[in-house]
Amino acid sequence: VSAGRDRGALAIVLHTHMPYVEGFGTWPFGEEWLWEAMAGCYLPLLDLLDEGAPLTLSLSPVLCDQLEAPDLQERFAAFVEGVRRETHSEDAAGLRAGGHEQLARELDRSWGDYERALESMRARGGEMLGSLARHAQWTSSATHAILPLLATDVGVRLQVHSGIAAHRRRFGEHWRGGFWLPEC
């Protein structure tokens, strides 16, 4: 590229989606999957975005539905303080009993990640989706459908229009035209 010419730009787009698991219990494919994603991905990502990380965020309508569910904070806290605390404690004790102190310390460290995630959630007043709102620039199809696999053009249009409408309903007119094409 010669001097004085535009060098372009780089966009890092993070797309977030979670199949609908809210209200389906915990193990093996229920809400536990959502709680783990919140603790390990969404809440740490929110901390980065709040610090000004230059990322573009895409939220699927299905994930948004789950993040605005009633009593989200209470159910997440019950998972972290109950299930996760107990399993981490038991697993760390088992590792120590087996002579694996270094692995037990790593498990103790990872428990701290869960505590920080819960603290972050509480600091946000349980408003997971509200906290993501100012960062949500892109959307996706209504149910994260793989659009080329839909049987009709009408179905494709409905998925796209419904996804955009859901985004605008939640986040106002702040949609910037970005649309993630689901692939999985």
Question: What kind of feature is each model-predicted range?
Answer:
Residues 1-32, 36-177, 184:
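Catalytic alpha-helical scaffold of carbohydrate-active enzymes acting on polysaccharides/glycoconjugates
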